[in-house]
């Protein structure tokens, strides 16, 4: 079993100024290749703390991947930290230096002297070429009493890291021979604790494993199995996956890479969809934007415009814009005024006494369904929840074949 840890270096990551998408990418890549990931750590640009974190990671793991800190400035300290832990002295590598100079010359520029540190190497490090940037990576091997330890240092920009990981790192790694297969089931309309209760003992077994995750679109359930061969792993996975599918069929809208909007598009089965939004800042239309069935949309909070789209003055006066009746009228209006086969509406309250309330409605001409959302969060969260709830409503109603 190959044990791994990820260390993300950068004060901007530590303070949340930039989302650490690289660690998520690496975690997925490792998991798909049967590597056991034990920890992910974020450290600021401090030589002492990065060195300490790296030493600790090496004491626990076989593979440590360090992301970031390979730039040319004084606060890019990953090379120095690795050298300190390895007790080796970095020195300029003539070939790397010539390569760096060539990059700048090809652009008609002179390489700044500060970039010379990007040509550093230590005796135990192999340089990893960077095809899209100026920061080479390091691939470091160290023999210990516990066996070989590997440190991989990669630059922080995702487009550089991802390409180098696939082209330079993976071919060099002693990956385990075991095969890992998995399927993720997407659900909505049920809480994570309820999903766990329904699955019962399945969530406590090891291989296949069954894990639940809360997502913006609902609760995901990942079923994974590993074995010596892919065929054996799939044979292990199949009965447990069938069991999970059966238990959660009522709430399931898709699997793996499918999106909720895509699932709605499939259920439309050639019919067109018109959308009217009020107070949602176009959140629903944005989710549907890439779907071929998405025919037209009207996004407005102007009462006069909404009345021309089907909202009655009586409803506006007596129930208000943020109401179930308003959502119903606008869903019907989406069919009529946007010339669509199916109408979907969402009305959201983000300020005032109805802040956090939202209503969505679906109208097929023969069926009308609504859903209510109460979410006392910030406006962006309320809009997001309302848009997802509208898609969930559309999927459930359409999947039921017009019977709700």
Curated annotation (Swiss-Prot):
One short Pfam name that applies is: CinA_KH
| Listed Gene3D superfamilies | 3.30.70.2860, CinA-like, MoaB/Mog-like domain
Family that this chain belongs to? Belongs to the CinA family.
Protein name per its UniProtKB record = CinA-like protein
């Amino acid at each position: 079993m190959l044990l791994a840890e990820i260390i993300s270096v950068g004060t901007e990551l530590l303070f949340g100024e930039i989302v650490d998408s690289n660690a998520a990418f690496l975690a997925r890549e490792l998991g798909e290749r049967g590597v056991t990931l034990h920890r992910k750590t974020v450290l600021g640009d401090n030589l002492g703390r990065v060195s300490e974190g790296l030493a600790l990671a090496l004491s626990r793991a076989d593979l440590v991947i360090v992301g970031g800190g390979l730039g040319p400035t004084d606060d890019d300290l990953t090379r120095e930290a690795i050298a300190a832990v390895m007790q080796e002295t970095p020195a300029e590598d003539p070939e790397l230096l010539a390569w760096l100079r060539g990059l700048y010359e090809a652009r008609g520029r002179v390489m700044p002297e500060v970039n010379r540190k990007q040509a550093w190497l230590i005796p135990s490090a192999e340089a990893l070429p960077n095809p899209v940037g100026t920061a080479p990576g390091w691939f470091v091997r160290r023999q210990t009493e516990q066996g070989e330890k590997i440190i991989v240092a990669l630059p922080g920009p995702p487009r550089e890291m991802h390409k180098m990981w696939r082209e330079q790192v993976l071919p060099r790694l002693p990956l385990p021979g075991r095969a890992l297969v998995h399927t993720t089931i997407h659900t909505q309309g049920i809480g994570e604790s309820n999903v766990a209760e329904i699955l019962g003992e399945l969530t406590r077994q090891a291989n296949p494993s069954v894990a639940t995750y809360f997502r913006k679109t609902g609760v995901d359930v990942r079923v994974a199995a590993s074995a010596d061969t892919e065929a054996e792993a799939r044979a292990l996975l199949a009965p447990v996956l069938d069991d999970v599918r059966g238990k959660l069929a009522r709430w399931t809208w898709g699997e793996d890479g499918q999106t909720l909007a895509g699932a709605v598009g499939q259920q439309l089965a050639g019919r067109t969809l018109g959308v009217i939004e009020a107070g949602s800042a176009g959140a629903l239309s944005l989710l549907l934007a890439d779907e071929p069935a998405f025919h037209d949309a009207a996004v407005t909070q102007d009462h006069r415009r909404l009345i021309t789209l089907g909202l009655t003055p009586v409803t506006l006066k007596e129930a208000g814009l943020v109401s179930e009746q308003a959502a119903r009228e606008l869903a019907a209006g989406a069919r009529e005024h946007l010339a669509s086969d199916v109408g979907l509406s969402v009305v959201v309250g983000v300020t005032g006494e109805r802040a956090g309330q939202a209503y969505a409605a679906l109208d097929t001409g023969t069926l009308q369904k609504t859903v209510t959302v109460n979410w006392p969060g910030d406006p962006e969260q309320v809009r997001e929840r309302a848009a997802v709830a509208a898609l969930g409503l559309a999927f459930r109603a359409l999947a039921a074949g017009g019977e709700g």
